[in-house]
Amino acid sequence: MKLSFHGQSTIYLEGNNKKVIVDPFISNNPKCDLNIETVQVDYIVLTHGHFDHFGDVVELAKKTGATVIGSAEMADYLSSYHGVENVHGMNIGGKANFDFGSVKFVQAFHSSSFTHENGIPVYLGMPIGIVFEVEGKTIYHTGDTGLFSDMSLIAKRHPVDVCFVPIGDNFTMGIDDASYAINEFIKPKISVPIHYDTFPLIEQDPQQFKDAVNVGDVQILKPGESVQF
């Protein structure tokens, strides 16, 4: 299995001969190394509806025929308003099996909406974190979130091999809370900081996060770099 980071919160997972992308913010992402014209993907998984996560989902889904996995509200919105054919709606606490592995939606403390061209925001359900089980490994993508103690319950129920955690502050946890979440609650084998340096408001030094973490290994990935099992 291979997990690649592509700026902001975009993660590309390759496992069981399938390709999965999380939060495909590609075209307008100054940190993303991917090309929307050449990305190949079988599944798209969304944590919430903000532009830097919802990103290129419509174009990518229509171009590739990928199944989009997201909140029930996002699935309905993509199907009804954008004509995306393959959608799979879920909600917090639910788990579903796919041919690459399983997806479970867990809690995240954030917000979730998409703003139309007319400036009107559309509610797209609760924000979520994602627990993947693929090839015998557990990957926890926290999504955009603040610190919450039930991260420990999530990790107790699903001991985490790799955790993708935001460190950007302002909109999500900063380095202090993110490192506390890793050290005290999640305790993964590998931590990967995400959701930083894309915009001025979330500029951070990931080395400070690495220095603050005292459990497992911290992998600071540049866009295009990966962790492989």
From Swiss-Prot:
One Pfam family linked to the record: Lactamase_B_2
Top-level taxonomic group: Bacteria
InterPro entries, alphabetized: Metallo-B-lactamas, RibonucZ/Hydroxyglut_hydro, UPF0173, UPF0173_UPF0282_UlaG_hydrolase
TM ranges: none
Keyword presence, DNA damage: no
GO molecular function, one term: hydrolase activity
Keywords: Hydrolase
PANTHER family found in the cross-reference section: UPF0173 METAL-DEPENDENT HYDROLASE MJ1163 (PTHR43546:SF3), UPF0173 METAL-DEPENDENT HYDROLASE MJ1163-RELATED (PTHR43546)
Family the entry assigns: Belongs to the UPF0173 family.
Protein name per Swiss-Prot or TrEMBL: UPF0173 metal-dependent hydrolase SAB1566c
Source organism per UniProt: Staphylococcus aureus (strain bovine RF122 / ET3-1)
